[in-house]
Amino acid sequence: SLFQLIGRTHEVYGSELLGPIVISMTHAASDVLTVLLLAKWAGCKTIPQITPLFESVPDLKDAPRILESLFTLGIYREHLTSHHNEQMVMIGYSDSNKDGGYLMANWSLYEAQEEITRVAQKHNIKLTIFHGRGGTIARGGGPANSAIRAQPAGSINGRFRLTEQGEIIALRYSNPGLAHRHLEQIASAVILA
């Protein structure tokens, strides 16, 4: 019934109203393909972008292989074509920190982004990496400008998305001047990256 509701929402309000469907704890290509299949079974005329979320260290290591298998499947390429060959991939910071500690997690995140970018470029896919960062250092927090500029070469390409967790919303957005400055810093870092 969720996919029927999505289909109805698209019919009434347009497909741009809803964002991507994020698949938490993506372990295999089948996790992504299941969403595509359910949407087709529900009769969705337009299927939202499907965004795999790689959270654990093992899943970050498997992410390039999973994306490679998706990008070579005809049915998934058709889906990507309907989204202008754009693929959003989300990476999580909390679970990877729990798995391997701060240094291991950050190195795994960095390597995953390099390899995900390479796979997307190989298949001419416009990649957006969606960063599931938290407010604390252990959850990927810290100065957004520095974090964006520290991403692997070619992984941003003017396309960047991040979460702003609840605990830092008030810190960054309660004062219009601070909010403006924070957004300026994010935009500046994306342009410079």
Regions found by a protein language model. Give the residues of each.
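Short, flexible turn/loop "capping" segments at secondary-structure junctions
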Residues: 13-15, 44
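Catalytic or ion-translocation cores adjacent to nucleophile or general acid/base/metal-coordination motifs
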Residues: 40-193
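Active-site-adjacent beta->alpha loops and helix N-cap segments on the catalytic face
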Residues: 27-35
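Extended, charge-enriched "interface" segments that sit outside catalytic cores
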Residues: 1-11
